[in-house]
């Protein structure tokens, strides 16, 4: 078969399922891939096929293999999406197609990492073995977690990230520029976590302020340690005063800035000029 020959054995129901899964129409698909709408409509009506290049573009768009669209029968969602993915999709049904693709890309990277770890001598490689935390005392939970991570008094996002990865949590930060690893600036999602007993994952959206990224990182860690579940969070979740979000917000705040750090602030030394507050609180801000 040459690249220009048309493949006739395409399963149109699988294209329809992918469009529904991504929340797009056939017109959207055609527009995004620069394929004539009429061509896709003929495929959906089983009146014509499409070239291998066209099918490959559709497969890459949905993050699937070409053979996925040649298989007969309906899609088994339990085989296509992991339980963690379905958890995130159920929490935020309005997730964009690009963000869903990013979640699946992160899952694939985790699979690659675990596969490499099996092939290599991984006896000394960190494994995710979280401490038992009290859910009824969030300050104590934060103290235990901070000790588990081995944090110093002053930290940055990179040192927090290194501490988590030393405990078997994979941490990704999205790109600030357009690309496959970007969470779009206009997208309200700030981060997500994938709970897995073998290898948990946290993804943090790149933001202007590093302190915001650090809070998002520890917010997601709270979901993993306190609730042992996957989660995806936006600005509203990181300011929520209800339920699990309230708990992980309190946990993240206490982990980043323990009460002992707050009591070390001397009000008598507070500068009269507000512009000097950054330098006055520099050590506490880098906790």
Label every model-predicted segment:
Residues 1-287:
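Short juxta-domain linker segments that transition from a proline/glycine-rich
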């Amino acid at each position: 078969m040459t690249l220009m020959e048309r493949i006739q054995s395409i399963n149109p129901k699988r294209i329809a399922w992918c469009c529904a899964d991504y929340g797009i129409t056939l017109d959207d698909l055609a527009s995004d891939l620069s394929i004539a709408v009429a061509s896709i409509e003929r495929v959906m009506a089983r009146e014509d096929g499409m070239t291998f290049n066209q099918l490959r573009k559709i497969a890459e768009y949905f993050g699937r293999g070409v053979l996925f669209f040649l298989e007969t029968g309906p899609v088994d969602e339990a085989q296509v999406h992991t339980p963690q993915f379905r958890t995130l999709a159920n929490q935020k049904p309005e997730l964009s197609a690009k963000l869903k693709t990013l979640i699946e890309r992160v899952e694939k990277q985790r699979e690659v990492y675990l596969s490499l770890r099996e092939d290599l001598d991984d006896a000394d490689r960190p494994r995710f073995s979280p401490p038992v935390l009290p859910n009824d005392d969030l300050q104590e939970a934060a103290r235990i977690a901070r000790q588990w991570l081995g944090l110093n008094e002053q930290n940055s996002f990179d040192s927090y990230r290194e501490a988590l990865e030393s405990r078997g949590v994979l941490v990704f930060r999205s790109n600030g520029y357009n690309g496959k690893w970007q969470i779009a600036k206009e997208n309200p999602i700030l981060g997500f976590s994938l709970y897995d007993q073998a290898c948990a994952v946290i993804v943090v959206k790149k933001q202007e302020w590093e302190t915001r990224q650090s809070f998002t990182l520890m917010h997601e860690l709270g979901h993993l340690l306190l609730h042992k579940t996957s989660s995806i969070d936006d600005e509203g979740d990181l300011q929520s005063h209800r339920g699990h979000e309230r708990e992980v917000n309190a946990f993240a705040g206490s982990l980043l800035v323990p009460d002992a750090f707050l009591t070390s602030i001397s009000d008598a030394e507070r500068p009269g000029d507000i512009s000097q507050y950054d330098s006055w609180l520099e050590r506490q801000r880098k906790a």
